[in-house]
Structures are given as C-alpha cells and as structure tokens.
C-alpha cells in the first residue's frame, strides 16, 4: 500500500484558549507548517492558528 498524500493536522489557536480546528493538508506540496487566520469562538475574535500534530 502507498503512503497517504493527505495528512490530518490540528490548527491550534495562538490566543491560548485551547480551541483548535482539525483539517487536512497535502504533505507533498505544503512541506512547511501551516498558519491560518480563523475565528476563535472562545476569544470571540479572529486569531492566528498554527499547525500541530494530532496525538
């Protein structure tokens, strides 16, 4: 069996609220860590989310 191209990652809020999104990314085309600006409902504003591994 071949190795999967897409992997699941966790986007953790930089506002230190503990909130995170789970998404997937293509590991071949996006080799660097993903960062996105998304809504954090705990902080009730848009903040930067950084990639972390799912344990």
UniProtKB/Swiss-Prot annotation:
Q: Which SUPFAM superfamilies does the record match to this protein?
A: Zn-binding ribosomal proteins
List UniProt keywords, sorted A-Z: Ribonucleoprotein, Ribosomal protein
Q: Does the keyword Cytoplasm apply?
A: no
Give a yes or no for keyword Ribonucleoprotein in this entry: yes
InterPro entries associated with the record: Ribosomal_bL33, Ribosomal_bL33_CS, Ribosomal_bL33_sf, Ribosomal_zn-bd
Gene Ontology MF term list: structural constituent of ribosome
Q: Name one GO biological process term.
A: translation
Highest rank taxon of the organism: Bacteria
Q: Which residues form a coiled coil?
A: none
Q: Name one GO cellular component term.
A: cytosolic large ribosomal subunit
Return the similarity comment. Belongs to the bacterial ribosomal protein bL33 family.
Name of this chain's protein = Large ribosomal subunit protein bL33
Q: Which organism is it from?
A: Rhodopseudomonas palustris (strain BisB5)
């Amino acid at each position: 069996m071949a190795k999967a191209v897409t992997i699941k990652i966790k986007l953790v809020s930089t506002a230190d609220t503990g909130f995170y999104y789970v998404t997937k990314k293509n590991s071949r085309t996006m080799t660097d860590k993903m960062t996105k600006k998304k809504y954090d409902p705990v902080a009730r504003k848009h903040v930067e989310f950084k990639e972390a591994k799912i344990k």
